[in-house]
Amino acid sequence: MVCYQDDTISYTQLFRFSDAERYQEIKEDLSNLLNLGLQIASITCDGHKATLKAIKKIMPGITIQRCLVHIQRMCLLWLTANPTYDAGKELRMLVLMIHRIETHNDKQYWIHQLNDWENKHKDFLKEKSYKAETGRYWYKHKLIRRSFFTIKRALPNMFCYLTDSNIPKTTNGIESYFGHLKNHLDLHRGLTKNNRINFIKWYIYFRNKSRL
């Protein structure tokens, strides 16, 4: 399910049953939100390619805030709890600092540290392994590279919340909402697919009603 929620009052403006975040569907949903007359100041999302592409197509001037928890969680997963290399250990420390950035000075210091890390380990990031039998090359430290470049690509949209305190820096609100919904569904595991869908619709209706 894809859900569009007002973070201020936890009101679900629109939802769609889908098995994935799909560009055409999200593009249509965003157009429908605008057609409803909603004034959208910013969007906080997990950074899925289809979602970002749809936002830039339908709302090219909108402020996009990347969910910091999502970035941090994925990078920590790739770097592991005990990285083998110093580059991984140092990058992991920087990743752990992300959620502590509360001022523009914090941001500038952190970015400076990240740039220093890149300059220090740029040759390490380029190291490749080679298989003579196939002539195939691949990056030797792909998970460290993935972590770093995930951050680097997200960087322009990571700290919008520092300029506007009304912008949520995470999607924790909607994640909590989904968690609560899942707990209710778990109590009714015997429901058919159709009845589960109807249950979700009524759940959203009554939750929205309580927010008005």
Language-model features, listed with the residues they occupy:
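Acidic/histidine-rich catalytic cores and adjacent linkers
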Residues: 42-52, 89-212
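A short hydrophobic/aromatic micro-motif that marks alpha-helical segments and, especially, helix-coil
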Residues: 21, 85, 188-190
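Short alpha-helical interface patches
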Residues: 23, 68-78, 82, 109, ...
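RNase H-like nuclease fold core
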Residues: 1-44, 49, 53-61, 154, ...
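Glycine-rich loops and low-complexity Gly/Arg-rich segments
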Residues: 10-14, 26-29, 38-42, 66-70, ...
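Conserved beta-strand -> loop -> alpha-helix junction used to position metal-binding or nucleic-acid-contacting
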Residues: 42-49, 54-96
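Low-complexity, intrinsically disordered/propeptide-like segments
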Residues: 33-36, 82, 94, 194
